[in-house]
Regions:
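A structural signal for short, hydrophobic/glycine-enriched beta-strand patches
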Residues: 2-151
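A transmembrane-helix-recognition feature enriched in membrane-embedded lipid enzymes
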Residues: 147-167
C-alpha cells in the first residue's frame, strides 16, 4: 500500500494519523506508524509532517503530543513536526491538518497519509471526499489477529464514512 512517488513528487502535505495512546506513550499500532514516519523523514529531509490526533476520554495526553514527542526523541528535528491536537476521527484528522498545512504555506491538493495498512483505504476515501489527491504510506499490523480484528472494524467504519459522504 505504499504509493509514494519519486522524492521530488512527494506531496508537501504529509499527515500522520493518530491512534490510541497508552499512558504517556504510543500504542503498538501508533508506534508502527511513527516508526514508518521516522524512516520517511530520514529519506526526505526537506519534508515536514503534521501529527494529528486529539485527546480521547481515556487518554492523559493528546495523540499529537505523544506522537511529536516520540518522533523528536527518536531523532526527528522538532522544526519538522507540526501538531494538530483537536481531531477526534479520521475526517477531522485530514480536515484540521489541511487547515494547518495551508496556514503554513503547503499545497494541500495532494496529501501523503501515514497510517496503518488496515486503515489506509478508508483514509484515502475520506481524503478524496475532501477534494484531496491521497497517497499512502502504510505501516504493518502485527500480530495477524489484530489485523483481522481491525480490518473487520474498518468494514463498518468505511460504510459509515461512505454514508456520511453521501448524506452529510
Amino acid at each position: 500500500q505504499d504509493s509514494i512517488m519519486a522524492q521530488d513528487e512527494t506531496p508537501a502535505f504529509i499527515v500522520v494519523l493518530g491512534a490510541q495512546v497508552q499512558g504517556d506513550g504510543p500504542s503498538l499500532t501508533l508506534k508502527k506508524r511513527l516508526d514508518k514516519t521516522l524512516t520517511f523523514m530520514q529519506e526526505h529531509p526537506d519534508k515536514t509532517v503534521i501529527v494529528s490526533g486529539g485527546q480521547g476520554p481515556d487518554e492523559a495526553y493528546t495523540e499529537a503530543s505523544v506522537m511529536a514527542r516520540y518522533l523528536i526523541e527518536h531523532g526527528a528535528d522538532a522544526s519538522r513536526v507540526i501538531e494538530e491536537d483537536k481531531a477526534s476521527n479520521t475526517r477531522e484528522n485530514l480536515l484540521f491538518s489541511s487547515k494547518l498545512a495551508e496556514a503554513a504555506g503547503f499545497d494541500t491538493s495532494r496529501v501523503l497519509i501515514v497510517t496503518s495498512d488496515f486503515h489506509m483505504c478508508r483514509a484515502k476515501y475520506i481524503a478524496r471526499t475532501l477534494s484531496m489527491e491521497p497517497y499512502g504510506l502504510a505501516s504493518d499490523t502485527w500480530p495477524w489477529i489484530l489485523k483481522v480484528n481491525y480490518t473487520l472494524r474498518e468494514v463498518f467504519a468505511f460504510a459509515k464514512a461512505f454514508w456520511q459522504a453521501r448524506h452529510g
